[in-house]
């Protein structure tokens, strides 16, 4: 039986996956720029996080739980990488465009231990950490492996990188009165708070509830709304140009016809 608390990550996975596939399909069909493609990939990373979280909440053994904890970390790294790529191109951050390969290198080095290495320095599967969460009147128990020092460093590095993303977004909207209503500004700050909360909870620093999947859902929804306006605007502009070109072609043909008739007179 599926635990009640896994409903939220299942919803997150479904919505994010559908949006990611739709945006990528639309991008490839219309050859829309890589901003949309990178966000589509970020949405698929959120889908992977939702799937791994739902499975973690329903794990019956510590070994099984650890597998999905690793998937969670990998999906978060992939999300941060693709979302950072999206932000630097959306805001046109020239410096980070040039040195984005550094982010790719760090991401690959961070992913490798969680995929290939079984060691207490990564995850200590001999120790467990229990979280009791009350969800709609039902007490849920989440059993997890204790993160090793390398994983703790990964958590810290992830928070630092996303803090950098958040700072760049805040700087871009500095002085704008309507910044709190802008989807990019609002969603990035919400997710940063959720990421810090979950990282501190995963390290055992605070006793809270995991809210990262909710933060992911809000970000995906808000940024998808932002991109939908941009995409529809681009499509409308393209259609307007096509109509204008058609009108010019008709005018050209009429002008050529008039000139021809006068030369024959």
Report each predicted region and the residues it spans.
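Internal transmembrane alpha-helix with an interfacial aromatic "cap," most often the third helix
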Residues: 20-28, 76-107, 166, 228-231
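Short, hydrophobic transmembrane alpha-helix segments
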Residues: 1-3, 21-34
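Generic start-of-chain signal for non-secretory N-termini
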Residues: 1-19
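Interfacial "cap-and-anchor" motif at the non-cytosolic start of specific transmembrane alpha-helices
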Residues: 2, 9, 33-36, 40-41, ...
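Hydrophobic alpha-helical transmembrane segments
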Residues: 14-18, 80, 158-162
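Amphipathic alpha-helical coiled-coil "transmission" helices that mediate dimerization
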Residues: 229, 233-265
């Amino acid at each position: 039986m599926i635990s009640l608390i896994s409903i939220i990550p299942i919803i997150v996975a479904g919505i994010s996956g559908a949006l990611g596939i739709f945006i990528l399909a639309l991008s490839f069909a219309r050859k829309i720029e890589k901003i949309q493609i990178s966000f589509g990939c970020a949405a698929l990373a959120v889908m992977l996080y939702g799937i791994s979280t739902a499975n973690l909440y329903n794990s019956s053994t510590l070994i099984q739980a650890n597998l999905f904890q690793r998937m969670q970390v990998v999906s978060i790294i992939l999300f941060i990488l693709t979302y950072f790529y999206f932000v630097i191109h959306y805001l046109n951050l020239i410096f980070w465009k040039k040195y984005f390969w550094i982010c790719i290198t760090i991401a690959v080095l961070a992913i490798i231990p969680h995929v290939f290495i079984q060691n207490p320095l990564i995850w200590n599967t001999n120790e467990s950490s229990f979280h009791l969460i009350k969800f709609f009147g039902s007490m849920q128990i989440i059993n997890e492996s204790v993160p090793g020092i390398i994983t703790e460093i990964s958590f810290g590095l992830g928070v630092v990188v996303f803090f950098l993303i958040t700072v760049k977004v805040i700087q871009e909207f500095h002085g704008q009165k309507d910044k709190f209503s802008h989807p990019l500004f609002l969603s990035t700050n919400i997710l940063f708070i959720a990421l810090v909360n979950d990282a501190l909870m995963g390290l055992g620093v605070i006793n809270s509830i995991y809210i990262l999947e909710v933060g992911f859902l809000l970000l995906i929804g808000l940024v998808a709304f932002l991109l939908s306006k941009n995409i529809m605007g681009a499509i409308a502009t393209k259609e307007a140009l096509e109509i204008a070109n058609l009108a010019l072609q008709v005018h050209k043909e009429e002008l050529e016809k008039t000139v021809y008739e006068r030369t024959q007179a």
